[in-house]
């Protein structure tokens, strides 16, 4: 990633930095400012990683604070996560899209289902207005057996023989360990920005990307008789009781495959009631007395209604607890 015409901000001062041929840089100029952030000039729709440091001379001190998609050619990013301090510097780096991932900008949406939704469950209430305040990347596909084995050296799936099938029979600790090992490997190789990490999606993030801007039962519509679901999902009626290679069905409007069906997907959250009202970046409850973690999306051996965007289900968080219909997809985010 290369810095492109980025403003570096130090508390109440701005340091203007520009990329020059051959890496030569003139002495920085300082101007007064009352914010902590960076002014980014680039192509509308392009994605940047915003980083900060207290020591701009130390190369390894820069840490990512946000992914930003430019709404205009000249965009001012202001970091409101912590109060401005005099020793904070910022820069913006053009982000190359990670392989097979989709960028999701910040947004607000309604989580849960209305009381009149067909085949809904009671735990989908109350509907909750959720704001996701930070952009993130999410995998187009469920993590495959080939990807999992490449990172961990193991393949616990009971459906081996095709590396394009989703990994399954993985516990929640297995899934989070995969994210940790992948993060360390990609950071060491310089393929992801410093300070970023792979992780499981939160339940709110998962439902938001599954809906892809819709409020219907599925990302493609309500489909009350499930006539179109077979075009998008593997489930009990067409799945032949086995997991299928990823990407064989149609994607949702944001380009995510198998978000309905194939295998259930682990989320980061402990299971809890939806809070109702308006919330920002919900993480779920701090614990669950029984040890349930949230899973989403439905699976090849579950009913059509279980593939709905709002369907909430759960499974135990224990290294020995897994199932042949349970896998995951990953998010790349700034902590």
What are these model-predicted stretches?
Residues 80-83, 169, 248:
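Short, flexible loop/turn segments at beta-strand junctions in immunoglobulin-like
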Residues 75-77, 165, 244:
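Short strand-edge motifs at loop-to-beta-strand transitions and within beta-strands
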Residues 5-7, 11, 15-100:
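Short, composition-biased motifs enriched in small/polar/acidic residues
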Residues 44-46, 53-58, 95, 114-115, ...:
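Acidic glycine-/aspartate-rich tracts in secreted/extracellular proteins
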Residues 97-157, 170-173, 260-261, 330:
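A short glycine-rich, aromatic-capped structural motif
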Residues 117-130, 214, 222-224, 239-242, ...:
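Surface-exposed recognition segments
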Residues 109, 162-229, 266, 272:
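Short, well-ordered surface patches within globular domains
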